[in-house]
UniProtKB/Swiss-Prot annotation:
Protein family: Belongs to the cuticular collagen family.
Gene Ontology biological process terms from the UniProt entry: collagen and cuticulin-based cuticle development; cuticle development involved in collagen and cuticulin-based cuticle molting cycle
Gene Ontology cellular-component annotations: collagen trimer
GO MF term list: structural constituent of collagen and cuticulin-based cuticle
Organismal lineage: Eukaryota, Metazoa, Ecdysozoa, Nematoda, Chromadorea
Keywords on record: Collagen, Cuticle, Disulfide bond, Repeat
Region (Disordered): 68-108, 129-324
Protein's organism: Caenorhabditis elegans
Name of this protein: Cuticle collagen sqt-1
Length: 324
């Protein structure tokens, strides 16, 4: 049901889009036609204006037949010296200043103002340009021109339009990026897509961690006794050659302490060591026993007895002998 609805909606949108396109094309065609008519009208007005200007130019050209003034240098103005005389190159005659004929009446009877009577034989070089003159009096209106000759009848020719082909302008430089526009309206949901192809099997994963040991199962029933096997042959071979000596094994653990051995023989007497420091003074010992009597001593020297002295000096009477 959803696929049919989507088809109907798509068809209706397509028809509406085509109608809008046709209306837009008709509008553009009408605008182009109006622009063409406006351009033709402006071209007709421009053609009439140019025809009128051309007639005015022809009339002015016929009426402006003025006699040219016969002089070679129109802007010849001699440069005066300090004394007021005009300058002239050496070896040439001085220039003759122009003589203006003054009008007979104050306002000029002839209406043309003063006239210039220049010397035609003057060969002086032209002087610097003079100042700009006063604008002249506007001239009289020209005589109306003659009527033109009637034109020859033209043949009936269909107007040919100028065919201008389209031309392609060179691509200009890339402009700066525009501002971010507003998000457009949400479009219609599209038809349901087809089922994708089934994916391929992935690579096997890494082995997981070892699980915990399960409970011990029940002991199975003993199986039936098997058939008797064949007698095996057990040949005894000769011993092989002695192999190479192996590497030294690691150091074994320390053994138990052994028994005390017998005392050894006394060694040789070593050299006398240095004298030690004097030790601290020990405590006084106990008083010893009285010793035996000593031997008789030597005879003492006889001293002269002192004189008799008063009783105060009798104290020193026992000092008459000295021991040797």
């Amino acid at each position: 049901m959803s696929v049919k609805l989507a088809c109907y909606v798509t068809a209706s949108v397509t028809v509406a889009t085509l109608m809008v396109c046709f209306m837009t094309m008709s509008t553009i065609y009408s605008e182009v036609d109006g622009f063409r008519e406006k351009l033709d009208t402006e071209m007709n007005v421009f053609r009439q204006s140019t025809n009128g200007l051309w007639k005015d130019i022809v009339v002015i050209g016929r009426s402006s037949k003025r006699v040219r003034r016969q002089y070679e240098e129109t802007n010849a103005t001699p440069t005066p010296h300090a004394d007021g005389s005009p300058s002239a190159p050496p070896g040439q005659p001085p220039a003759v200043p122009p003589v203006f004929n003054q009008p007979k009446t104050p306002n000029g009877a002839n209406g043309n103002g003063p006239t210039c009577n220049c010397n035609a034989d003057n060969k002086c070089p032209a002087g610097p340009s003079g100042p700009k003159g006063v604008p002249g009096v506007p001239g009289l209106d020209g005589v109306p021109g003659l009527d033109g000759v009637p034109g020859v009848g033209a043949d009936d020719i269909a107007p040919q339009r100028e065919s201008v082909g389209c031309f392609t302008c060179p691509q200009g430089p890339v402009g700066p990026p525009g501002a971010l526009g507003r998000p457009g309206p949400r479009g219609l949901p599209g038809p349901r897509g087809q089922n994708g192809n089934p994916g391929r099997d992935g690579q096997p994963g890494h082995p997981g961690e070892q699980g915990s040991s399960g409970q011990i199962g029940k002991i199975g029933e003993p199986g039936p006794p098997g058939e008797k096997g064949r007698d095996a042959e057990h040949p005894i071979g000769r011993p092989g050659p002695k192999g190479p000596r192996g590497d030294q094994g690691p150091t074994g653990p320390a053994g138990q302490n052994g028994l005390h051995g017998p005392p050894g023989e006394p060694g040789t007497v070593g050299p006398e060591g240095p004298s030690g420091k004097q030790g601290r003074q020990g405590p006084d010992g106990t008083q010893g026993e009285t010793g035996p009597d000593g031997r008789p001593g030597k005879d003492a020297e006889y001293c002269q007895c002192p004189d008799k002295s008063p009783p105060s000096e009798a104290v020193n009477a026992n000092r008459g002998y000295r021991n040797i």
